[in-house]
Regions:
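N-terminal membrane-targeting/pre-transmembrane regions
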Residues: 1-38
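Hydrophobic, well-ordered secondary-structure segments
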Residues: 5, 25-28, 48, 121-125, ...
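Pocket-edge structural micro-motifs
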Residues: 11-13, 124, 138
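Short, aromatic-rich membrane-interface segments at the entry and exit
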Residues: 38-47
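Conserved beta-hairpin
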Residues: 50-89
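Alpha-helical transmembrane segments and their immediate juxtamembrane interface regions
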Residues: 60, 128, 133, 142-146
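Non-transmembrane, membrane-adjacent beta-strand/coil modules in membrane-associated proteins
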Residues: 76-135
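Cytosol-/stroma-facing membrane-proximal "stalk/adaptor" domains immediately downstream
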Residues: 137-153
Length: 153
């Protein structure tokens, strides 16, 4: 949770160390493949380009946050008034995998990151919205679900 005044819930999606390490390894392998046979300054170019791109990509993905503020659920890519939400379900890793994969509905709104294994599924009860549910990645499904069930109060 964060320190935002008026926020009933706040969670940052900071990438864990293994994501940073994986990004560096992928960038190094790709750069090594591209620089094969190059000499001099041309051998350095793939590393100088791919390493910063990989790190900036992870940094950008880590900027996501879930917030419940002033009766509104805010996630990367969307926001919805809590009044339009119905049932709330906490999902463990296996349930999250199923809802993101074989049981996914095409119209569902999904906001998560690869390193967030758990999630909260929230039914949408807005008559003007054909989205059946929101799937929100979180490290603390119980805490987020409790806030959503209490409608952010």
């Amino acid at each position: 949770m964060g320190s935002t005044v008026g926020a009933a819930y706040e969670e940052r999606w900071t990438a864990p160390p293994w994501v940073w390490a994986a990004a560096v390894v992928v960038a190094l392998v790709a750069a090594a493949t591209l620089h094969s046979g190059a000499d001099g300054a041309r051998a350095v170019v793939p590393y100088a380009v791919l390493l910063p791109v990989a790190l900036l990509t992870v940094l950008r993905a880590s900027r996501g946050r879930v917030r419940v503020v002033d009766g509104v659920l805010q996630v990367p890519g969307g926001r919805i008034a809590l009044d339009h939400l119905g049932g709330v379900r906490e999902l463990d890793r296996e349930a999250t995998r199923r809802v993101r994969g074989p049981l996914a509905q095409p119209r569902a709104f999904v906001s998560t990151r690869a390193w967030l294994g758990e999630a909260v599924q929230v039914q949408v009860e807005d008559p003007d919205d054909d989205t059946p549910y929101w799937l929100i990645g979180t490290r603390a499904p119980a805490a987020l679900a409790d806030v959503l069930r209490s409608r952010g109060r």
